[in-house]
A protein has these predicted regions:
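Acyl-donor (CoA/ACP) binding surface of acyl/acetyltransferases
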Residues: 1-31, 62-155
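Conserved GNAT-fold acetyl-CoA-binding loop/helix
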Residues: 28-49, 59
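PAS/LOV-family and closely related PAS-like sensory domains
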Residues: 51-55
Length: 155
């Protein structure tokens, strides 16, 4: 578990599935992703997240607010191995419910994840990527100290 001033980043609970599905089915949240996810697809995603965390001891963390204990999305690490010049690797990523956008939550949680990775010597390199035009994600990347290395076509 990782704590920040306002957030708790923790392992996933089955109770997270329905609010996670609501996030994944929101067209505005999913605007820069291939498609919205159904409940069944969200359950499959949840299972992959839990399996990756079980395998490595870290992964995409469920994010909840300290003030009210509500699940608001995820932030954390994901192993990728798609065909790219920098693959395989570890990505830091985030997805929050839109009512929690523009409040610094993604930046706060992502910084805490990077600090955790540094302190525990988890990775030599961490990547983050987004779709051209997703300025919100680009701003988070900049705020956590990442810099653009390249453009690529995601398979």
């Amino acid at each position: 578990m990782i704590e920040t001033e306002r957030l708790i980043l923790r392992p996933w609970l089955k109770d997270d599935i329905l609010p996670f599905s609501a996030i994944n089915s929101d067209e505005e949240v999913m605007e820069y992703l291939p498609k919205c996810l159904s409940l069944e697809e969200t359950v499959q995603f949840y299972n992959r997240i839990v399996a990756e965390h079980d395998r490595f001891g870290y992964g995409l963390y469920a994010v909840e607010t300290k003030s009210d204990g509500l699940f608001i999305g995820y932030v954390g690490f994901h192993h990728f191995d798609f065909d790219a010049g920098f693959s395989p690797g570890v990505e830091i990523g985030w997805r929050l419910a839109k009512e929690y956008w523009n409040q610094g939550y993604a930046t706060e949680a992502a910084k805490a994840c990077l600090d955790y990775a540094r302190i525990n010597h988890l990775f030599n390199e961490i990547y983050s990527f987004t779709t051209v035009g997703n300025h919100r994600s680009e701003r988070v990347m900049q705020k956590i100290g990442m810099s653009r290395v390249c453009f690529f076509t995601h398979p």
